[in-house]
Design a protein with these regions (language model features):
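Exposed, low-complexity/repetitive linear segments and helix-based recognition motifs
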Residues: 2-8, 80, 117
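Secretory targeting and sorting signals
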Residues: 3-36
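Signature of Gram-negative chaperone-usher
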Residues: 34-196
Length: 196
């Protein structure tokens, strides 16, 4: 009989302890929920890069066979530009050249032209802002015995042209029927200049 009473007493004590534990836990949850909100500051430091060519523009090679008629030869030239400045000031692609010569033979100083605007596309892996180009075409590549002052052949207006993008002009070389045969060479200079 005594053992049964003790067992019941122990059972009641266990229940009481569980009730007390539940109440204590509930109080802790209420205390945690009542804590005031905390604010913090997130910082992202973005360092400016530079304006330049991703890789040096490649050579442009024209080829034609004289056939007694005036000819126009077309050749494309991908130009990979990187504007990592983060400034949004825009940029200009300028060009100049020396006259095509083969010994004493020369082509016209207006032989090389662009009849339309170059194409422009973001490079793979670059979420770029395509350049807004304001150059009027056709464009004639400046040429002379000594390269004259460079002129703009393509540009990016303010807040455009950010990231890496490839500009592809389709150059046209005029070869009159009276052109003498030979291998003509010309030195071209392409430059990137900051500003709209």
């Amino acid at each position: 009989m005594m053992q049964a009473v003790e067992s019941r007493d122990r059972g009641r004590g266990s229940v009481r302890r569980r009730v007390i534990a539940v109440l204590a836990l509930t109080g802790a949850v209420l205390a945690w929920a009542a804590q005031p909100a905390s604010s913090l500051t997130g910082t992202a430091t973005i360092t400016a890069g530079s304006l330049g060519f991703v890789s040096a523009p490649g050579n442009v090679s024209f080829a034609a066979t004289l056939n007694g008629t005036d000819q126009t030869i077309t050749q494309t030239q991908p130009i990979d530009v990187s504007d990592a400045t983060g400034s949004g000031t825009g940029w200009n692609l300028t060009a100049t050249s020396t006259t095509f010569t083969a010994g004493a033979k020369t082509l016209s100083t207006s032989a090389t032209t662009l009849t339309g605007a170059p194409t422009d596309a973001c490079d793979a892996g670059s979420t770029c802002t395509l350049a807004t180009n304001a150059i009027t075409y056709p464009y004639t590549l400046p040429a002379g015995a000594t390269a004259p002052t460079a002129t703009k052949l393509f540009n990016a207006a303010a807040n455009t042209g950010l990231g890496n993008q490839t500009i592809t002009p389709s150059w046209k070389l005029s070869v009159p029927a009276s052109t003498q045969a030979g291998t003509y060479t010309s030195t071209w200079t392409l430059s990137l200049v900051s500003g709209p």
